[in-house]
Regions:
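Small/aliphatic-rich secondary-structure junction motif
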Residues: 1-43
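Short, surface-exposed alpha-helical segments at coil->helix boundaries
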Residues: 17, 42-53, 104
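Solvent-exposed polar/charged
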Residues: 22-25, 81, 111-112
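Conserved hydrophobic residues forming the short capping helix/wall of the S-adenosyl-L-methionine
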Residues: 24, 52-56, 80
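General small-molecule cofactor/ligand-binding pocket signal
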Residues: 32-34, 64-68, 119
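Structural beta-alpha unit
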Residues: 58-90, 95-98
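Gly/Ser-rich helix-loop-strand patches that form or flank binding pockets
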Residues: 87-122
Length: 122
């Protein structure tokens, strides 16, 4: 499976990175990591990219890492459609005190607009 993982620096997206790398290793998935700007994250994109590359260097997986400029949700959807990805993976989905799932604006846009399946990792 050809998987596009969006990582924006939130703790959820870094957790999604670990989980998606594990799955790619187990399933033989082709992984591309898109480092996106997330206005809700305190970590800048340089640091996010460094962490992504560090995580990938510790496993026997060749993955493409790219910096994606512009609106993160729109760009992830565009890339998935234009490059033939089978799935978009994203971190997100905190549970509220009332038991409802709260998702960020990037994940919401991707879930509502992606032409492929979306794997939301919590």
């Amino acid at each position: 499976m050809k998987v596009l993982l969006g990582v924006g620096g939130s703790s959820d997206s870094l957790t999604a990175l670990e989980a998606t790398v594990e799955r790619a290793l187990a399933a033989g998935d082709e992984l591309t990591v898109a480092v996106v700007e997330n206005p809700q994250s305190d970590i800048d994109t340089d640091e996010v990219e460094r962490r992504v590359r560090e995580e990938l260097s510790s496993v026997p997986l060749e993955a493409d890492v790219r910096r994606v400029e512009g609106d993160a949700g729109s760009r992830l959807v565009e890339i998935a459609e234009s490059e033939g990805f089978d799935q978009i993976a994203l971190g997100g989905g905190q549970t509220s005190p009332m038991g409802k799932i709260n998702i960020g604006s990037i994940a919401e846009f991707v879930l509502l607009n992606a032409p492929v399946s979306v794997h939301l990792i919590r």
